[in-house]
Design a protein with these regions (language model features):
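Active-site neighborhoods of divalent-metal-dependent phosphate/nucleic-acid chemistry enzymes
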Residues: 12, 18, 59-122
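Short, well-structured N-terminal submotif of metal-dependent ribonuclease cores
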Residues: 1-34, 40-52
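Non-catalytic, well-ordered alpha-helical scaffold segments
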Residues: 33, 37, 87-90
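Ligand-binding grooves and catalytic loops that recognize ribose/phosphate and carbohydrate rings
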Residues: 47-57, 67-68
Length: 122
């Protein structure tokens, strides 16, 4: 299963991505509340329709704030340039069995690669 980051979704909304379309058709996509939240704050066409459709996609493991704090410490994520929302998404991908994170955010991708949860389907 592929946890698709907001950066990939936003690009897909603007210009459809064949790889993402195939994943969606196969049911191989996961989302996260924070990813949907980031997209909700964007100015995109058909915003409401997009948000309704995103909420239909299965979600990755929910991770508590305490688990994220522990994750940050255990994997020394401080100083990597990722933000707290990114740390939540990364921890969720890490803790969801078989999940991989697809992002176009360079710092998040590099960190996901170090944790062996990255995928790049561009």
């Amino acid at each position: 299963m592929i946890l698709v980051d907001a950066s990939v979704w936003i690009d897909h909304i603007r210009s459809p991505n064949d790889a993402l379309e195939r994943l969606l058709e196969r049911g191989d996509v996961l989302t996260h509340a924070f990813i949907i939240g980031e997209i909700a704050l964007c100015h995109i066409r058909r915003r409401r329709d997009v948000l309704v459709e995103l909420r239909k996609i299965p979600t990755s493991e929910a991770v508590s704030d305490e688990e994220v704090f522990e994750f940050i410490e255990r994997y020394r994520l401080f100083g990597t340039g990722i933000g707290y929302v990114d740390a939540h998404i990364l921890a969720s991908a890490f803790m969801t069995p078989g999940a991989r994170l697809w992002t176009r955010d360079k710092r998040l991708r590099v960190t996901a690669e170090k944790l062996n949860v990255a995928t790049n389907l561009n």
